[in-house]
Structures are given as C-alpha cells and as structure tokens.
From Swiss-Prot:
Function description: Receptor on natural killer (NK) cells for some HLA-C alleles such as w4 and w6. Inhibits the activity of NK cells thus preventing cell lysis.
Keyword terms, alphabetized: Cell membrane, Disulfide bond, Glycoprotein, Immunoglobulin domain, Membrane, Receptor, Repeat, Signal, Transmembrane, Transmembrane helix
Glycosylation sites: 67, 84, 144, 178
Protein name (Swiss-Prot/TrEMBL): Killer cell immunoglobulin-like receptor 2DL1
Oligomer status and interactors: Interacts with ARRB2. Interacts with PTPN6; the interaction is enhanced by ARRB2. Interacts with PTPN11; the interaction is enhanced by ARRB2.
Impact noted for substituting residue 332 to A: Abolishes interaction with ARRB2
Transmembrane residue ranges: 246-264
Ranges in the topological domain labelled Extracellular: 22-245
Tissue specificity as recorded in UniProt: Expressed by NK cells.
Main location: membrane
C-alpha cells in the first residue's frame, strides 16, 4: 500500500492521502480550538489534539473529506502528548466538523478511537439578527425565560450562545410574521443570569453564520449569582453530591442525638421526682402516725363504784357514828373506748 505525503508549509502540517487505518485500538484523545470554534473569516485558529496516552502521531480529519487526513508528530510534556494543527487563514472551505486520532510508531495503521466532534464555524458573513427577552432582561427568580432571535433576513436556522458554554442551542426559524423570521428559545425557570448572543444561518451552508447579535444580559433578581452555571462545568453552589450526603447524614445524627438527650433528661427528671414524692409520702405517713398518737391517745376510763348506792345499810345518827373515819374501797374498772372518765365511789 502506497501513501502519498504532501507537505503544506502554509498551515504547518502534512496531508496524508491513502487508505484509512484501523481505528479504536486506544482510547480517544481530546480536540480543542484556540481561541475558539467560532472564527471570523481570514482569522487564525489552532486545533489542538491531546491525550494522556503517549501517542507518537496525531491525525486530524474533517468530515466529508474521506481522502484527506492531516498528520503531525506528537509532542510529549508532563505526561501529556499533543499536537497543534494551525490554520493561518480560515476560509469557508476549511470550516466544518473535525475529529482527531492518535497512533503509535510500531503500529501506524492502528489508531485510537476518534475524539468528540468539533465544529469550526465562520461568523460575520451576513446581517446580524436581533435578540430580546419576552419578559424583559430583568426577571424574578423562578419565572420562565424565553429569548427571541429575529431578523428580516430569511434565515433557516437560529443559534443561541451563552458566554462560558461550549455549545449553542439551535432552532429553526418560524414563519414570517410582520416582516421578520423568528425563533423563540425557552430557557425554563430563571435561576441565574447570563450574557447571550444569537446568529442566523442557511441550510445549504450550516458552517457559515451571520454576524453576532448585540449581547443581551439577562439578570435574575432574588438570586445573589449573576452567571448561569455551565452544564459542562460544576457549580460551586451545587456542591459535590458526596459532600451533600455527608452533610445531610451529619445533620440527621445531630438531630437524633439532641432528641435522645432530651428524652433521657426527661426520663431522669421524672424518676427523680417520683423518688422525692415517695420520700415525702413516707414522711407524711410517719408524721400523721405520731400526731395521732399525741393528739388522740387511748383514753382509759376509770369508774369508781360507790357501793353505798347499791347496798342497804342502817343510817345512824352522827353522834352514834364511830370516830375513826371509814375506809372507803375504791374499785376501778377499765372501760375500753370510753370518751370520758367517771368515778364511782363504792362504800363498804
């Protein structure tokens, strides 16, 4: 198999014609455009193909050009291999979708999987469209935002870009209304602001766009951030899901610990109060018992029976009574549960 290698000094790379090698042996490299993939006519653009695999060569391919492949020797720096494909003057013929591949020296016909596609577009060729926000450039957080791109030129497609994003949204132009062709881009509920631009293009030249519209700054009130997070870049406000799970788990543990401490404290308080009440009840019972013994002693009723009442004897005159005093016999009878004491004198 013969290969025809043609040196192209104006762009600093080689053009390789021949059979397409077998691909997919190594993992895909990455393809970037500097200063960007939207390039004005006659400007310089550099397409950089790089990988952490130490490729000896890099190949650049443009879709639709099956017989042409651009090849460069890779440079190795800090564990990365790369090659810069420089296009000094961008023209309409060089615009299109590019991919790059990597290969090693010992198997030049076995290349890596292709990189993700990169569209190189020439802008500034046609009249610029107009970009507006249906609710105005300042909206409340949560309101639905719709941006309208319109022009009197009969563009078939409109492209909406936002600063910081690598890819654009695109929508076909609607029917002509009031002399303009328009496309409405719904962005959904507003959470962050951003700067937007739109372009117009035709079906027969999808890589040739109009001039950029005037920039439109969309501001969202009620939100401290003024920039919309890019879908390809992580947001610092969103945070790492793992860290978020750790934060939620820690919060749950703290709440459970507080509840457990509260329940334990309440249980100990109830137990202490119950012990104090038992001691007070025992003291009250002892005090009541002592008061009962002091205030209500068992009264013993003594009854002194006077047998004079129950015996009959002869009453003598005082002069006839003996001079020695009589001896009275006193009999005490203990009457249980008596409330008073009575004394009955018994006479002999």
């Amino acid at each position: 198999m013969s290969l025809l290698v043609v040196s192209m000094a104006c762009v600093g790379f080689f053009l390789l014609q021949g059979a397409w090698p077998h691909e997919g042996v190594h993992r895909k490299p990455s393809l970037l455009a500097h200063p960007g993939r939207l390039v004005k006519s006659e400007e310089t653009v550099i397409l950089q193909c790089w990988s952490d695999v130490m490729f000896e060569h890099f190949l650049l391919h443009r879709e639709g050009m099956f017989n042409d492949t651009l090849r460069l020797i890779g440079e190795h720096h800090d564990g990365v291999s790369k090659a810069n494909f420089s296009i000094s003057r961008m023209t309409q013929d060089l615009a299109g979708t590019y991919r790059c591949y990597g290969s090693v020296t010992h198997s030049p016909y076995q290349v890596s999987a292709p990189s993700d596609p990169l569209d190189i577009v020439i802008i500034g060729l046609y009249e610029k469209p107009s970009l507006s926000a249906q609710l105005g450039p300042t909206v409340l957080a949560g309101e639905n935002v719709t941006l309208s791109c319109s022009s009197r030129s009969s563009y078939d497609m409109y492209h909406l870009s936002r600063e910081g994003e690598a890819h654009e949204r695109r929508l076909p132009a609607g029917p002509k209304v009031n002399g303009t062709f328009q496309a409405d881009f719904p962005l959904g509920p507003a959470t962050h602001g951003g700067t937007y631009r739109c372009f117009g293009s035709f079906h027969d030249s999808p890589y040739e766009w109009s001039k950029s519209s005037d920039p439109l700054l969309v501001s969202v009130t009620g939100n401290p951030s003024n920039s919309w997070p890019s879908p390809t870049e992580p947001s610092s406000k969103t945070g790492n899901p793992r860290h978020l799970h750790i934060l939620i788990g820690t919060s749950v543990v703290i709440i459970l610990f507080i509840l457990l401490f509260f329940l334990l404290h309440r249980w100990c308080s109830n137990k202490k109060n119950a012990a104090v009440m038992d001691q007070e009840s025992a003291g009250n019972r002892t005090a009541n018992s002592e008061d009962s013994d002091e205030q209500d002693p068992q009264e013993v009723t003594y009854t002194q029976l006077n047998h004079c009442v129950f015996t009959q004897r002869k009453i003598t005159r005082p002069s006839q009574r003996p001079k020695t005093p009589p001896t009275d016999i006193i009999v005490y009878t203990e009457l249980p549960n008596a409330e008073s004491r009575s004394k009955v004198v018994s006479c002999p």
